Curated annotation (Swiss-Prot):
Organism of derivation: Stutzerimonas stutzeri (strain A1501)
Subcellular compartments: Cytoplasm
Name the record gives this protein: Ribosome-binding factor A
Entry's family note: Belongs to the RbfA family.
Gene Ontology biological process terms from the UniProt entry: maturation of SSU-rRNA
Amino acid sequence: MAKEFSRTQRIGDQMQRELALLIQREIKDPRLGLITITAVDVSRDLSHAKIFITIMGQDDDQEAIKGNLRILNDAAGFLRMQLGKSMKLRTVPQLHFNYDASIRRGVELSSLIERAVAEDRKHSDERGE
């Protein structure tokens, strides 16, 4: 049995693919880092879309993150126009770019777990178990 996806989810997936290409090919700002779109959440009425991004190599630099978000939000009108040309939608959602910290947080939690396991092994070896 096939999985059922809502229309907004299908539109979000298509927007994610289209925006990735547009950002890579059309935005020529040298200040823009290597952007990865992790998710696109589209409202039910298709009026707004939240685009979640990560920036490779600049995850710890808050100023770089803010600068990249500013560049993308300033280019949102242009990107929306280009999406309108490539997607068959009556109305194209307004684009809102947000930083996705979940990947960075996942890496931090993974390192904490690895450290805890290493300390546990060290203590069990000292006790002779």
